[in-house]
């Protein structure tokens, strides 16, 4: 049961990293999006 949860968490983290990478590549010339992402990431870090 524990291994299944770890596997799920790894897939979830991989999906989040891939999503951020795709958005970063797509919005290469938009600094506002980067600011929003940095704010969102720092907010998540303080939340957990």
From Swiss-Prot:
Residues 1-21 form the signal peptide. The keyword Signal applies. Keywords: Plasmid, Signal. The keyword Signal applies. It comes from the Bacteria. This is Uncharacterized protein pXO2-20/BXB0019/GBAA_pXO2_0019.
């Amino acid at each position: 049961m524990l291994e299944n949860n770890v596997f799920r968490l790894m897939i979830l983290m991989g999906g989040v990293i891939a999503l951020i990478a795709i958005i970063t590549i797509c919005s290469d010339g938009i600094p506002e999006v980067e600011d929003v992402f940095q704010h969102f990431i720092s907010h998540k870090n303080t939340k957990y």
